Regions:
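Ordered hydrophobic segments in well-structured contexts
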Residues: 32-35, 78-80, 92, 177-179, ...
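Non-catalytic surface loops within mature trypsin-like serine protease
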Residues: 97-99, 149, 184, 222-224
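Conserved donor-binding loop and adjoining core beta-sheet/short helix segment
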Residues: 63-71, 75-114, 123-127, 142-144
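Extreme N-terminal leader/anchor segments
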Residues: 1-4, 11-13
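Short amphipathic alpha-helix that is part of the acyltransferase structural core
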Residues: 12, 17-67, 74, 78-90, ...
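Accessory, usually C-terminal, subdomains that scaffold auxiliary metal cofactors
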Residues: 187-189, 193-257
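Acyl-donor binding region in acyl/amide transferases
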Residues: 106-216
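C-terminal/domain-terminus segments
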Residues: 25-41, 45, 51, 65, ...
Length: 258
């Protein structure tokens, strides 16, 4: 049984990353992108990166991360970028699938302490009704995005690859809805500059989330997002469609773009 760890030492993280890379066929590029199931032992690399970035930014230590995200570890799907030259993780995104414990963003809205309009909670049924969500199994929760500061200006070249494997996974799992809690400035850039169809989740205002101020819970209709991406980047759209032209779809652990 996999132990879900948020407090590895740097040498432990680096050794696990090197082992992970030894199991993959890599191209000639410096950065490689992968999808990793939350139950995979290698997902601890992404958990470690989450903790490092969140602790540096907001003081969220391993105990806090385990408390907040531990209940969702087995229903998580990580998208991870690895620096194959230095053999260290360069970025990690966590999507949470629906499970008996629910989707974290929606569960938190139904909590009288964590809700954006606390002490008033927003019931799960109200969120579903507000956005026309019939089945939470077709919804992803964009739980975390962690990029170490030294890589934040170096990942532009991998952005398209990362978005591609995420889109492939979403299409494979027939995901129709997306929820998340994002920094309000990120929401403004995504919505006003990039034109992404993000709207406040259940009409909620910005709020403080996990000690980080100025956050916004958001919703997006996934087919609209994918359609927009396809129109704005025709080559990526064609590559996604080509990937799904084959009868056999790859499993998440086979998704890798170089």
């Amino acid at each position: 049984m996999t132990e879900y760890v948020y407090d590895m030492s740097d040498p432990e993280r680096d050794a696990l990353t090197e082992h992970f890379l030894s199991t993959k066929r890599l191209g000639c590029g410096r950065f490689a992108c992968f999808a990793i199931e939350g139950t995979d032992p290698f997902a601890n690399i992404a958990r470690q990166l989450e903790r490092e970035v969140f602790e540096a930014s907001w003081g969220n230590d391993s105990v806090t991360m385990k408390q907040e995200y531990g209940p969702y570890d087995e229903s998580s799907l990580f998208f991870m970028v690895v620096d194959t030259q230095d053999k260290v993780p360069a970025a990690a995104l966590r999507m949470i699938r629906n499970s008996p414990v629910g989707l974290k963003t929606i569960v938190d809205l139904d909590d009288c302490q964590k809700s954006p309009i606390a002490p008033t909670a927003i019931p799960v049924d109200e969120v579903m009704r507000h956005h026309g969500i019939d089945d939470l199994d077709r919804c992803w929760d964009g739980a975390t995005a962690a990029i170490p500061r030294r890589y934040r200006r170096k990942l532009a070249a991998t952005h398209v690859h990362l978005m591609r494997i995420m889109a492939l996974a979403a299409m494979r799992e027939d995901i129709q809805h997306f929820v998340a809690v994002l920094d309000a400035p990120v929401v403004r850039v995504a919505r006003d500059i990039l034109g992404l169809p993000l709207i406040p989740l259940a009409g909620t205002p910005p709020f403080t989330h996990m000690d980080a101020p100025n956050n916004q819970a958001v919703y997006a209709h996934v087919p609209s997002l994918l359609g927009l991406a396809g129109r704005r980047n025709r080559k990526v759209g064609q590559r996604i469609k080509a990937s799904f032209a084959d009868e056999a779809l790859p499993s998440p652990d086979q998704f890798a773009a170089r």
